[in-house]
């Protein structure tokens, strides 16, 4: 994806500066492409190697049987659907597959500060979980959603009039230590309410200010508490967006669908 390359370029600038601490703001990131999660984590892991496991995947019975079948193994002899390793290149499909070297800063990083919220979910949590075994990850903000499962898209592609599809939960993912115990979300090391008083990126914004104080060792100046804009930021969303989020959050701990009917 284009944004993977843009992120890679930004990390490349940090690499030139030999940074030791990184702040990653995931508080409004509901997730996305697994490939992007792998690419991003590959930019941050120490001693990057394609032999290192980023995540393991456990599927429901139907998918497990299929991936273990002789037909799958004969058709895809080089595929391992049960684990994903870190990547040294970002592969973008085009008329031909283009490969771009990953800009990795893992060997200079001492720790990562993740700014989190109750909207941090799925692939965002996957990045946190996947990096935890390799370097210190400090969370600042609110507890994350706790979506350690994944789905697959099912629709009737042959029917041109079809406008419906569904995405059943069919897998759970783990980090390299086989840890996946965050169905109630990652609890932050430092709980701080979201700061609606300051713009994102403002060094006085509550969560970022806390991260900076942890990096510099200089206590953040006390400030007047930001006014409460909403009881919940989700209530400010359009109905469809809020409804979509609630579906993700409420179904996050539902396990595998094994029925064939």
Question: What does each model-found stretch correspond to?
Answer:
Residues 27:
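Short strand-turn motif at the edge of the Rossmann-like AdoMet-binding core
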């Amino acid at each position: 994806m284009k944004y993977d390359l843009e992120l890679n370029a930004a990390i490349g600038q940090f690499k030139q500066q030999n940074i030791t601490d990184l702040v990653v703001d995931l508080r409004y990131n509901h997730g996305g492409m697994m490939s992007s999660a792998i690419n991003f984590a590959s930019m941050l892991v120490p001693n990057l190697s394609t032999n290192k496991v980023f995540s393991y995947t456990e599927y429901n019975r139907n998918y497990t049987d299929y991936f273990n079948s002789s037909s799958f193994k004969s058709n895809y002899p080089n595929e391992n659907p049960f684990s994903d390793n870190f990547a040294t290149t970002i592969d973008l499909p085009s008329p031909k597959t283009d490969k771009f070297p990953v800009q990795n800063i893992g060997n200079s990083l001492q720790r990562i500060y993740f700014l989190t919220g109750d909207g941090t979910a799925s692939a965002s949590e996957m990045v946190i979980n996947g990096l935890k075994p390799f370097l210190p990850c400090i969370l600042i903000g609110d507890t994350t959603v706790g979506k350690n499962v994944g789905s697959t898209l099912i629709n009737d592609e042959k029917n041109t009039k079809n406008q419906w599809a569904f995405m059943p939960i069919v897998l759970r993912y783990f980090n390299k230590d086989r840890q996946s115990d965050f169905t109630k979300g990652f609890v932050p090391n430092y709980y701080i309410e979201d700061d609606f008083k300051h713009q994102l990126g403002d060094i006085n914004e509550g969560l970022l200010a806390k991260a900076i104080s942890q990096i510099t060792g200089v206590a953040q100046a006390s400030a007047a508490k930001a006014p409460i804009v909403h009881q919940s930021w989700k209530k400010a969303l359009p109905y469809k967006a809020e409804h979509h989020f609630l579906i993700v959050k409420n179904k996050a701990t539902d396990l595998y669908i094994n029925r064939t009917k």
